[in-house]
Amino acid sequence: MSFTSRSLLASFTGCLLYGTPAIADNGSEPVSPENGIVFPLQTDAVNSCEVPDKKSKEEEDQQPVLIQADSVEASNNSKAVYKGNVHIIKGRQEIKADSITLHQQENIAIAEGNVDYSSMEMRTTSDKVTTNLSTEDTTMVNTAYKMSCQPIRGQAGRVLKTGQEIYQLEDASFTTCPADDNSWRFKASDIELDQSDEWATFYNARFEVLDVPIFYLPYVTVPVGDTRKTGVLIPSIGLDSKNGFELSVPIYWNIAPNYDATTTINYMERRGTQLETEFRYLTELGKGTVDAEYLNEDDKFKDKGSRWGVSWDHSGIYQQHWKFDVEYSKVSDIDYFQDLNSSIGTRDEGQLQQSGEVSYRSQDWDMTMRVRDFQVLVEEQTPYRLMPQIEFNYYAPQFYSEFDFNLHSHISKFTTDDKAKPSATRVHLEPKLSLPLSGTWWSLIPETSLLYTYYQQDFDKQPVGPNGSLNLDHEVSRTIPEVRINGAIYLDSTHKFLGEYLQTLEPKIQYLYVPEVDQSNIYGGTGDGGYDSSKLQLDYYGLFRDRQYSGVDYIADANQFSVGATSRFYDDAYKERMNISFGQILYLNGSGTEQNNDDKNSSAWAMESDFNYDDYLFYHGGIQYDSNVSELQVANSTLEYRFSKGYIQANYRYVSKNYIESNVNFEDDLSLITQHGIYQAGLLSEYNLGRNWALKGQYFHDTKEDQMIEALVGVTYLSDCWSFGLTYSDQLIAPESAKTIGTYEPEYESNLMLSIAIRGLGNNTGITSGSANNALDYGRPFYLNN
């Protein structure tokens, strides 16, 4: 008897037992005796990851049992034994085996010998499989398994499938590595794989690397998807030259659909045990995160006592009109970020903001109430607290003909702990009238404003007035008009630059007039700081501002023209490939900067440029050159070459000491920070060595002092199921006592970081340590359109 004849006979017996044809012609798939049986349900559907809905499941339950085998033995219409290349499909279950016994009354199939079992969630090879074809309850013996929808595989002495999507594995292993790769795996007495919750739970588990046990856990859960579930996550291990051996055990809390938290127990060999908690929430008032860190006793710095940090970030919109924002951070001491790695901040933090805002926004107006304070992380600095500020803005576009009107106003209360500084209440009103005009190739916006400010200034212990220490008035009001006219032209060239680039020219001019008003009876009213004012950087885009200072404590007088132009170059696809902008302010009555008694006729030249050649060579540069004193004030330049395996970037930053002194208010001696200004060169690169290896390097150097600022080198290995990283870094640290730059030997903090991560277990889980991130890092300061 031929093979095809035996298969037909076995299938015919299945029809007698189950009353449904096992051979079917669906109208599009012809039955060919030479090719054997054609099943209506193909193997691709059996192996689908799609979870059937209730209706689909009911339809599958009504589908016939499709059987193919070399031979069959039937017994009393109650069971049949199929032998030789047995193949069964029922709904989304598929079984291939040397022999299968079908029990009609119980609807149970017992497969033995080289059993391949496939369902919607799992594919296995076993010695024996017993399955209920109706309920899909299944037992497998001596099984190698692979999940269909996740990169998970392993072996198990016994597999039990209960319900539709839950598997229980006994004496089992678990890994996300590809076949024949046991770089890492879990071995456990019991593993529960819940496909609906997308989590795996291990009991009496040990973690092995290259078959070597690393650690034992009596209980642990890991995600096999993105679904959240409470449980102990995979521990983190690392090696840090600052903290020694590190072990972190995270515990995830799925509190509610819109609340969760992760508590991490961090053991640091040289520091002690730290508790770290991240709480996340989502409500109708917005979303936010609360982070808290606590180290009861720092073994390395015992004199600093318990060390802690906390932060709260919130942002949300309520009923389309209300907006809430909170940014609050606080740490136990000013050296916290220097001594400890933290998720709250980095070692280059100079202060932590503590602010909150509540806003109501309508079509024509908005109102905001805000409070703001700072924790200063340097000694002997006491910034002002804003307690509180109420801001009101009104907008009336085209309120009369083509004229626009808007009103900006606020009332602010400033307090400070510095007894040498006044506290104050400030009221500011600023109505503005403008006439925006434009055509296809031009725009012109004349506008006029009136700035009215009232102050009530108080000293806690010193009188304010003509005899006060700062010669300030207790009450003072100031009214300053402002006129501003801004115009621009947009021109396209009819000839292509270099035969392939469309060039545009965009000249721009602005006239600004602000009369000179004596403001010396206001704290900060001479341009040397104030309650919330500081001088703004005068780059190209700053040439066309109407203010030299943030805040309103000092309004610099102005009678000036700002002139500039931008030229852009586009390729045939209208992608911007290059631009260059340059400009200058021409002063008619001096610069208005009372601080320097300036009587010069022009500002420094400002220029910005960006370049993109064929999407692999990028450049950005900017300079400010003061021709009045023949001094380069500010310069920055970045050149980056990108290729298929990585990039290399060189950058340089220069700021003259005179520019720093003129634009930044230092309460301390500037020589403690710099003797000559900023002369900083950097070189950064990443390179992929083949498919798995990557190298990373960073180096920053002070070219004036001829000393390294920071350096970092790292290597990373990335495979299909795990990654390894080793990073070494050196960072220049400030001296413990106040010393003038250049009078002491530089000191560096060295860190060696080891990181190991396993892949394929959801988005947020892995064995990993922290990274040796430096204060200076890679950036892409390229601003071309498209």
Curated annotation (Swiss-Prot):
Subcellular location: Cell outer membrane
Domain of life: Bacteria
UniProt signal peptide: 1-24
Main localization category: membrane
GO biological process: Gram-negative-bacterium-type cell outer membrane assembly; lipopolysaccharide transport
Keywords: Cell outer membrane, Membrane, Signal
InterPro entries from the UniProt entry: LipoPS_assembly_LptD, LptD, LptD_C, OstA-like_N
Keyword Lipid biosynthesis appears in the UniProt entry: no
GO cellular component labels: cell outer membrane; transporter complex
Subunit structure: Component of the lipopolysaccharide transport and assembly complex. Interacts with LptE and LptA.
Primary role: Together with LptE, is involved in the assembly of lipopolysaccharide (LPS) at the surface of the outer membrane.
UniProt family annotation: Belongs to the LptD family.
Name of the protein described by the UniProt record: LPS-assembly protein LptD
Annotated source species: Aliivibrio fischeri (strain ATCC 700601 / ES114) (Vibrio fischeri)
